[in-house]
Amino acid sequence: MALDSAKKREIIAKFGNDEKDTGSPAVQIALLTERINEINEHLQQHKHDHSSRLGLLKLVGQRKRLMRYLKRKDHDKYLEVITALNLRDRV
C-alpha cells in the first residue's frame, strides 16, 4: 500500500529541509507513520490479512530504529517530529 505522490510531496515539504530531502530521518519517520496508519485502517476492515499484519510489524520496527537514531543524534528534531505526528516517546 504505497502512498500517492501528492501526499508524499506534502510530507516531504513539511518535515524535510527542502523538496528533495527524502533521506533525512524525520522525513522517513513521517512517511513510515503515514504508511503505518494506512495499513492499520486496512487491517481494521480485513482482520485476517496476516501478510499485511507482518508488513505492518516490519514497518513499525523500522520506524522505531529511525526514531532511536534521531533521538540520539538530534534530540530537538526528535521532539518536534513526535509532537507533529502524535507519537509517544517510547524509544
Curated annotation (Swiss-Prot):
Keyword rRNA-binding annotated: yes
Single annotated GO MF: rRNA binding
GO BP field: translation
InterPro entries in the record: Ribosomal_uS15 (IPR000589), Ribosomal_uS15_bac-type (IPR005290), uS15_NS1_RNA-bd_sf (IPR009068)
A Pfam family hit: Ribosomal_S15
Key words, A-Z: Ribonucleoprotein, Ribosomal protein, RNA-binding, rRNA-binding
GO cellular component terms listed in the entry, alphabetical order: cytosolic small ribosomal subunit
Quaternary structure and interacting proteins, as annotated: Part of the 30S ribosomal subunit. Forms a bridge to the 50S subunit in the 70S ribosome, contacting the 23S rRNA.
Record function comment: One of the primary rRNA binding proteins, it binds directly to 16S rRNA where it helps nucleate assembly of the platform of the 30S subunit by binding and bridging several RNA helices of the 16S rRNA. Forms an intersubunit bridge (bridge B4) with the 23S rRNA of the 50S subunit in the ribosome.
Similarity comment: family membership: Belongs to the universal ribosomal protein uS15 family.
Alphabetized HAMAP family for the sequence: Ribosomal_uS15_B (MF_01343_B)
Protein name: Small ribosomal subunit protein uS15
Gene designation: rpsO
